[in-house]
């Protein structure tokens, strides 16, 4: 079984969402700025609920924001 990892475009979509800050996104999602920073850096994989909330706040489908890569 090959090792896959979760990648994301949170930073890109956050910037395109009127240059939303990490703090603003975190507040709307219900997590800290540090959590958003860790997700963007690929150091933390969000829960499924958190991933859906991020996509919803950014106004994008989940698959536009998060990708499962080999």
For each feature predicted by the language model, list its residue ranges.
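Residue-level signal for the short linker/turn that defines the boundary of a DNA-recognition helix
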Residues: 8, 19-20, 46-49
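The alpha-helix within a helix-turn-helix
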Residues: 14, 26, 55
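Residue-level detection of the helix-turn-helix DNA-binding "recognition helix"
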Residues: 15, 30, 41, 70
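Short amphipathic recognition helices of helix-turn-helix/homeodomain-type DNA-binding modules
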Residues: 64-70
């Amino acid at each position: 079984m090959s090792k896959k990892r979760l990648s994301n475009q949170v930073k890109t979509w956050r910037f395109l969402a009127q240059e939303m800050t990490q703090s603003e996104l975190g507040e709307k999602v219900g997590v800290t700025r540090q959590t958003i920073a860790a997700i963007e850096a690929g150091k933390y994989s969000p829960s499924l609920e958190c991933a859906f909330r991020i996509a919803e706040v950014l106004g994008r489908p989940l698959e536009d924001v998060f990708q499962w890569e080999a």
